[in-house]
């Protein structure tokens, strides 16, 4: 679901391309590459990488999710053993949570050592950016930050995205229920649409109560879920940081209105 990039710090590092984000919003991936490159990273996309296996893992399809994950493990291992990697950078937190769990997922399988090595260098893009010299800026827009469950609870990354947005000059606010789910939750919005819809309505209401210019999030699933319920533009955190440091204005800011949520085909 994410895009992952591997980066070597020229500071080298790397990234990866996830399946849903590639289809739903390629601007996020483009912004990630631009920003990391601008900050001195050598960004590469490992040949053979693909879906992290998160969605099928959520659905209990263990064999299918492990087969998908194994392709990534092999692809990244080739890079690690080749020119080397400092990090596997992931810009969708739902995928990041899964990749960081590869060591546990494969603990009793032949790829156990390789899976543990991959999981050990997997990082959310906000973790990487906190280690780089992101310049200060003075953007000024009021941004309501939505903390994805997979980021704040799954990965225990609670402050980095907000710190980075503040450094870029955005006025950051949060909804009163910032610790609660928006209802996307992997495949939950597909399997339990009624309850998911209630969670979405509550989250949209509390975000709109902050009267922001922009809503920011770090997970494509949350962005699609919340964006389908509000006219306030919702933008990935990395797109805002890219814009603040010289990149293009995010396209979502010029296309307000509720976004239709595409329904994926789940085998």
Walk through the language-model features, giving the residues of each.
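Iron-sulfur cluster-binding electron-transfer modules in prokaryotic oxidoreductases
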Residues: 1-267
């Amino acid at each position: 679901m994410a895009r992952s990039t591997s980066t070597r710090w020229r500071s080298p590092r790397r990234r990866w391309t996830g399946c849903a984000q590639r289809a739903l919003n390629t601007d996020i991936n483009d912004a990630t590459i631009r920003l990391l490159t601008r900050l001195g990273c050598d960004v590469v996309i490992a040949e053979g990488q693909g879906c992290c296996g998160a969605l099928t893992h959520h659905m209990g399809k263990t064999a299918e999710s492990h087969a998908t994950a194994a392709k990534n493990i092999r692809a990244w291992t080739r890079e690690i053993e080749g020119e080397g990697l400092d990090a596997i950078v992931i810009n969708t937190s739902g995928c990041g949570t899964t990749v960081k769990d590869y060591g546990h997922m494969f603990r009793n399988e032949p790829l156990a050592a390789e899976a543990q090595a991959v999981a050990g260098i997997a990082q959310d893009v906000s973790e990487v950016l906190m280690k780089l010299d992101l310049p200060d800026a003075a953007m000024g827009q009021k941004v309501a930050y939505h903390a994805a469950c997979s980021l704040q609870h799954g990965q225990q990354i609670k402050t980095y995205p907000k710190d980075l947005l503040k450094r870029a000059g955005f006025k950051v606010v949060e909804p009163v229920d910032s610790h609660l789910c928006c209802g996307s939750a992997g495949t939950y919005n597909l399997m339990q649409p009624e309850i998911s819809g209630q969670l979405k309505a509550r989250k949209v209401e509390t975000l709109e109560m902050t009267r922001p210019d922009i809503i920011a999030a770090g997970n494509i699933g949350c962005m699609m879920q919340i964006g389908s319920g509000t006219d306030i533009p919702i933008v990935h955190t990395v797109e805002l940081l890219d814009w603040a440091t010289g990149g293009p204005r995010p396209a979502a800011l010029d296309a307000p209105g509720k976004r239709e949520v595409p329904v994926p085909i789940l085998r």
